[in-house]
Regions:
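Alpha-helical scaffolding within the catalytic cores
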Residues: 16-20, 76-79, 143-157, 183-195, ...
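Aromatic-lined carbohydrate-recognition surfaces of secreted/lumenal glycan-active proteins
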Residues: 93-98, 122-151, 200-214, 237
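Substrate-binding cleft of extracellular glycoside hydrolase catalytic domains
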Residues: 7-135
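Substrate-binding cleft of secreted/luminal carbohydrate-active enzymes
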Residues: 201-281
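Active-site beta-loop-alpha junctions enriched in small/polar residues
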Residues: 3-5, 37-39, 98-100, 142-146, ...
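Aromatic- and acid-rich polysaccharide-binding/catalytic face
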Residues: 152-182, 238-240
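Extracytoplasmic/secreted cell-surface and envelope-processing proteins
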Residues: 7-10, 42-45, 104-107, 148-152, ...
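Aromatic-lined glycan-binding groove of carbohydrate-active enzymes
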Residues: 157-162, 188, 192-202, 232-233, ...
């Protein structure tokens, strides 16, 4: 909750630790992605508090909570501007604001604002951060895995405000869930490949993963065949939660899919941080 001036994020990780880890990943030659699950400025609830209408309206210019929200953006800008390497250079970050907006579980989601209001929110965020010296961001647009390209692009703020096209897509662990996941991933990656060409933007799977990884060969038999066919920049799996033992998306030693993940890691067509040289040159 950086917008509140808290010292820890919603996963109870100190922001100073996050800052240090972002810099360390950059020094290793890797890329950091950052999302923002900010509180509901109208109710004081969390990002999932969608009981009250008009939250986005309230923070746009002229809204009752606009000044408060601008203060929140200021705190975010301070943190992003603090991401500097030992040589003084700012650390590049892939910033993924207002994500999964085609769903309605966040207060900035589809049912809670118009397409125009969403675009205004995105542009206001972008312009404020740019004006306040945050010049180390690449902006990622990441709706949910929409079956129709029209739904994907409906709230797109424009090529001048977006650097990468992504999407978030998750399966359930049963056979039906895996089949539906394959279908959804294929549908989105097919049209996203075309959109990337049309808009001259790289594409990515900005969130995915199988919770608790009960399918032992998920990495090589489910995920890899899906992403192998398309020109994606990266695929990101979600977090391993300290406070929820079964809420994890990357394996640990001895976990059912751990050996399969090693096979995935060693595949000649996958690249991890140690495989990438001179990303920033």
């Amino acid at each position: 909750h950086i917008e509140l001036g808290a010292d820890k994020n919603l996963d109870n990780i100190p922001f100073e630790r996050i800052r240090q880890d972002i810099i360390a990943q950059y020094l290793r030659g890797g890329l950091n992605t950052v999302s923002w699950h900010l509180n509901n400025p109208l109710t004081g609830g969390d990002a999932w508090d969608v009981k009250t209408a008009g939250v986005v309206t309230s923070i746009l210019p002229g809204g009752a909570k606009h000044d408060q929200f601008i203060g929140w953006l200021g705190k975010l800008a301070t943190f992003l501007n603090s991401l500097t390497a030992p040589d003084g250079k700012k650390v590049p970050v892939l910033f993924r604001p207002w994500h999964e907006h085609t769903g309605s579980w966040f207060w900035w989601g589809r049912s809670h604002c118009t397409p125009q209001q969403y675009k205004e929110l995105w542009k206001m965020t972008h312009d404020y951060l740019s004006k306040h010296g945050v010049n180390n961001l690449l902006y990622a647009y990441s709706p949910g895995g929409e079956d129709k390209v029209e739904d994907y692009i409906e709230r797109y703020p424009g090529d001048n405000y977006v650097d990468l096209l992504g999407f978030d897509c998750y399966p359930s662990a049963d056979v039906q869930g895996t089949d539906a996941y394959r279908k959804s991933m294929t549908t989105v990656l097919t049209y996203l490949t075309q959109l990337g060409k049309e808009h001259n933007k790289p594409i990515a799977v900005t969130e995915t993963g199988l919770e608790a990884l009960p399918i032992a060969d998920w990495w090589t038999e489910v995920l890899f065949p899906l992403v192998d066919k398309y020109p994606i920049s990266y695929v990101l799996v979600w977090r391993n939660a300290r406070e929820k033992p079964n809420h994890f998306y990357a394996p640990y030693p001895g976990q059912a899919s751990a050996q399969n993940f090693v096979e995935f890691y060693n595949h000649p067509k996958t690249k991890f941080c140690s495989d990438i040289k001179n990303l920033y040159k």
